[in-house]
Amino acid sequence: MEATQFQAMLEERGISLSSQALAQFERYYELLVEWNEKMNLTAITDKPGVYVKHFFDSVSPAFYYDFSEPFSLCDVGAGAGFPSIPLKICFPHLRVSIVDSLQKRIRFLQHLVGELGLKDIALYHDRAETFARQKGMRESFDVVTARAVARMPVLAELCLPLTKVGGTFLAMKAASAPEELKEGEKAIAVLGGEVTATETFMLPFEEGERTIIFVQKTKKTPARYPRKPGTPNKQPIQ
């Protein structure tokens, strides 16, 4: 896949990429492959695969949600920067915070952000469970994203405490989303959220089905959540 083809696919979805943004995606791909030789960032390294399964997929929330306003976005468990860095490239006015529990991934992201010349990005080496208890972080973000990092009850406990009341939690899932949504219903309600929409689409070239679950934060999360690191995964709210 050429970058211009990627540009055209996003254009069809109403997202226009500048020449600078295109160049940033190209450099992102180069750095991802280069650093992947030193550390495990992604199993997908071929150019078409990265552009479709990482870049296009990461930008997909903007097909259904208005990213034109300058709001704060927190990406939980971003790994190699997905979905927040592609979203930031497309929408430079976003104020982005990235939380990841692995220091080596944060090192990659620091290098990436510098190389791409991205501003207004904060990187945190932390677990979501403890990050949400830091002063100034809890219930402070307009949008919180997570891309396939855990099952829905677990994701909700990691992300909704960071989402401000009136804000939105976007859970980006693969094809198993309907079962996960059912499994996560109780946790979402307990944590102060309400599912407002689910959007399902196919990646280009039939590279798989994706679903985005939109959860609005309607009331404050009870103070006991999130629980200690590891507990949400071992004993999910059900």
Swiss-Prot record:
Query: Pfam families, per this entry?
Result: GidB
Coiled-coil regions listed in the entry: none
Residue ranges of the region described as Disordered:
219-238
Q: Where in the cell is it found?
A: Cytoplasm
EC number in record: 2.1.1.-
| Keyword annotations of the record | Cytoplasm, Methyltransferase, rRNA processing, S-adenosyl-L-methionine, Transferase
Q: Which GO terms describe its molecular function?
A: rRNA (guanine-N7-)-methyltransferase activity
Query: Mind telling me what this protein is named?
Result: Ribosomal RNA small subunit methyltransferase G
- Originating species: Geobacillus thermodenitrificans (strain NG80-2)
What gene codes for this chain? rsmG
